[in-house]
A protein has these predicted regions:
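Active-site phosphate-binding strand-loop segment of PLP-dependent enzymes
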Residues: 12, 111, 123-178
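Conserved PLP-binding catalytic core of the aspartate aminotransferase-like
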Residues: 286-317
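Conserved active-site segment immediately N-terminal to the catalytic lysine
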Residues: 171, 185-196, 205
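Active-site C-terminal subdomain of aminotransferase-like
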Residues: 195-277, 291, 360-363
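PLP-dependent aminotransferase-like
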Residues: 79-146
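A glycine-/small-polar-enriched, mobile loop at the entrance of the PLP active site in fold-type I
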Residues: 5-56
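Conserved N-terminal alpha-helix of the aminotransferase class I/II PLP-enzyme fold
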Residues: 34-81, 88, 102, 110
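PLP-dependent enzyme catalytic core of the Aspartate aminotransferase-like
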Residues: 1, 6, 319, 332-363
Length: 363
């Protein structure tokens, strides 16, 4: 690759689009004649406010976000939102969660600190290899919201059809599939996403929340920074935000617009994932771990059936210039994360390497 870069299959932080990195490099020492790098700017300056405004406007255009939704750029990652969602949205102290993998499981554990959590469906029985049927969930009338992790980064499952919430608010953690395909924001009460997987550098989460869900009658013990009202009333500027992440993400939003938006990005992601899944389906050594109907386009876990051989594959791929293919420590195996910025050439090169590895080890 150009600049001696590697195909980085990390689950996050992950690859960013090369044209974006080049533009950031070119603006590093003197951003648009300001005489300083964005990392050096006051977040209260006019030049930085323009960066924030452009980033929000471009994201709104990309996702066609309705006017009655707020866009917030908040420090920290998705894990902080496990608590923030429950603390801000549990007006009646009750929420329904769907357990589909490691991240929804962690969100459930955190939400239980703030109210009653009903796990209405789970795929734990088959090691989170599918999405349970959520067409007729048992949802109490006084439920504040229904929560899903729309793409489970570790287990590699994704929702192809949203749950029937029976009129209740839907909250979705989209961290590992954010901006990977078109999204009808009106289907959700709230979307949030840690940006380090599919958008920019680590340390920030994007929150898209319907205005009527931003409450004033919140627990007075809640840290003021975790209040969505605090963030919304101050335009994500209650304190110094993650200025660098906002800037970098703004560049990615513009890049996505330039290539044809989320429809085009979705087509590319389908093509990329197909290269790897087609190989896994015919391989005698490597096997995918997710039922085909629920396979993620972003995170592709697979195994050889032998922990020792899995480790050998990881070592061999790293030596060949394909980084971060080791599966998450909680599940083992292997995992290829092919987020937006991964070119299809990366998927093709990985498959060719795995074919060669398989041939050499099955003689």
């Amino acid at each position: 690759m150009k600049y001696g870069r590697t195909f980085n299959f990390s689950a996050g932080p992950a690859m960013m689009p090369e044209p974006v990195l080049e533009e950031i490099r070119d603006e590093m020492m003197n951003y648009r004649g300001s005489g300083m790098c964005v990392m050096e700017m006051s977040h209260r300056s006019k030049v930085f406010q323009q960066i924030v405004d452009e980033a929000e406007a471009d994201l709104r255009e990309l996702m066609n976000i309705p006017d009655n939704y707020k866009v917030l750029f908040i420090q920290g990652g998705a894990t902080l939102q496990f608590a923030a969602v429950a603390w801000n949205l549990m007006k009646n102290g009750k929420a329904v969660y769907i357990e589909t993998g490691a991240w929804s499981k962690k969100a459930i554990a955190e939400a239980k600190k703030y109210g009653e959590v009903i796990v209405a469906a789970s795929s734990k029985d088959k090691n989170y290899s599918y999405i349970p049927d959520c067409s007729d969930l048992d949802i109490p009338e006084d439920t504040d919201y229904v929560y899903i992790c729309e793409n489970e980064t570790i287990h590699g499952v994704t929702w192809n059809k949203l749950p029937n919430t029976k009129g209740h608010v839907l909250v979705s953690d989209q961290s590992s599939m954010f901006l990977s395909k078109p999204c009808n924001v009106s289907d959700y009460g709230m979307i949030y996403a840690g940006v380090q997987k599919n958008v920019g550098p680590a340390g920030m989460v994007v929150v898209i929340i319907r205005e009527d869900l931003i409450r004033e009658d919140i627990d007075p013990k809640m840290p003021i920074y975790m209040s969505y009202k605090t963030q919304a009333d101050n335009g994500s500027m209650y304190n110094t935000p993650n200025c660098w992440a906002i800037y970098c993400c703004g560049k990615v939003f513009k890049y996505l617009k330039s290539i044809g938006g989320l429809e085009e990005m979705h087509k590319r992601n389908i093509a990329k994932a197909k290269v790897i899944y087609d190989f896994l389906d015919q391989s005698k050594m490597f096997k995918g771990t997710v039922e085909p109907e629920f396979r993620s386009l972003m995170n592709i876990p697979f195994v050889t059936g032998s922990a020792e051989l899995d480790a050998e594959v990881v070592a061999a791929t790293k030596a060949a210039g394909y980084d971060n293919l080791k599966g998450h420590k909680s599940v083992g195996g292997l995992r290829a994360s092919v987020y937006n910025a991964m070119p299809i050439e990366g998927a093709e090169a990985l498959v060719e390497f795995l074919k060669k590895f398989e041939a050499e080890h099955t003689k």
